[in-house]
Amino acid sequence: MEVNILGLIATALFIIIPTSFLLILYVKTASQQN
């Protein structure tokens, strides 16, 4: 099976970017509560 590098990178970015964005929002709200 041939691995599509660009597809792999696009999938990784598609997963990592929203996750990190939600993580940053969570940290901001958590720090505001303290």
UniProtKB/Swiss-Prot annotation:
GO cellular component terms given for this protein: chloroplast thylakoid membrane; photosystem II
Nucleotide-binding in keyword set: no
Ranges annotated as spanning the membrane: 5-25
Major place of residence: plastid
GO BP annotations, alphabetical order: photosynthesis, light reaction
Compartmental location: Plastid, Chloroplast thylakoid membrane
A Pfam family per the record: PsbM
Membrane-related topology note: Single-pass membrane protein
Keywords, comma-separated and alphabetical: Chloroplast, Membrane, Photosynthesis, Photosystem II, Plastid, Reaction center, Thylakoid, Transmembrane, Transmembrane helix
Domain of life of the native organism: Eukaryota
Keyword Metal-binding attached: no
InterPro entries membership: PSII_PsbM (IPR007826), PSII_PsbM_sf (IPR037269)
Function: One of the components of the core complex of photosystem II (PSII). PSII is a light-driven water:plastoquinone oxidoreductase that uses light energy to abstract electrons from H(2)O, generating O(2) and a proton gradient subsequently used for ATP formation. It consists of a core antenna complex that captures photons, and an electron transfer chain that converts photonic excitation into a charge separation. This subunit is found at the monomer-monomer interface.
Oligomeric form and interacting partners: PSII is composed of 1 copy each of membrane proteins PsbA, PsbB, PsbC, PsbD, PsbE, PsbF, PsbH, PsbI, PsbJ, PsbK, PsbL, PsbM, PsbT, PsbX, PsbY, PsbZ, Psb30/Ycf12, at least 3 peripheral proteins of the oxygen-evolving complex and a large number of cofactors. It forms dimeric complexes.
Similarity comment: family membership: Belongs to the PsbM family.
Protein name: Photosystem II reaction center protein M
Lineage: Eukaryota, Viridiplantae, Chlorophyta, Nephroselmidophyceae, Nephroselmidales
Protein's gene: psbM
